[in-house]
């Protein structure tokens, strides 16, 4: 009888653990589907819930940043991008999004630093970096000219 109870307990534990790992994956996948359907508030809730179960999931932070970008909350967007990069320093999409924010803030030094990192890790979005660097070239001389006239 004692062995039988242990077997039942072990079975319940195994089922419980497997359903927990399934739910972790399910939160992200369900959130991603909601994000694609532009249901950002619901998606944000599930991405945040996924982070509770899987705090080292850089993609959840990346998609939270994308949601905050849509909502024009740059502070939260930047925070989530920085967190995604702490977890995955080679996340080219997070690097690219941070470069765009730095460019928007006229933080050209940060754009250059991020661009140097981006060039080392880019696989799919390499052309985007060229566009950012080109716009940086067009802006910097104007800034230098205005400073020299002062």
How would you label these PLM feature ranges?
Residues 36-37, 70-71, 104, 138-142:
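Register position in tetratricopeptide repeats
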Residues 50, 83-84, 117-118:
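Canonical positions in the second alpha-helix
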Residues 53, 87, 120-124:
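Structural marker of alpha-solenoid helical repeat scaffolds
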Residues 57, 91, 125-126:
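Residue-level recognition of tetratricopeptide repeat
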Residues 63, 97, 131-135:
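Canonical tetratricopeptide repeat
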Residues 112-150:
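Terminal, low-structured helical/coil segments at or just beyond the last alpha-helical repeat
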């Amino acid at each position: 009888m004692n062995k039988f109870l242990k077997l039942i307990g072990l079975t319940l534990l195994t089922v419980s653990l497997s359903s927990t790992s399934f739910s972790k994956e399910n939160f992200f996948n369900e959130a991603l589907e909601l994000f694609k359907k532009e249901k950002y508030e619901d998606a944000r809730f599930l991405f945040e819930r996924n982070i509770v179960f899987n705090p080292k999931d850089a993609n959840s932070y990346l998609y939270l940043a994308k949601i905050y970008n849509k909502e024009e909350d740059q502070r939260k967007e930047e925070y989530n991008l920085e967190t995604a990069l702490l977890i995955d320093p080679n996340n080219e999409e997070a690097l690219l999004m941070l470069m765009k924010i730095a460019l928007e803030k006229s933080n050209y030094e940060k754009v250059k630093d991020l661009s140097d990192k981006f060039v080392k890790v880019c696989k799919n979005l390499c052309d985007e970096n060229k566009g950012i660097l080109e716009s940086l070239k067009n802006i910097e001389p104007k800034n230098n000219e205005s400073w020299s006239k002062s």
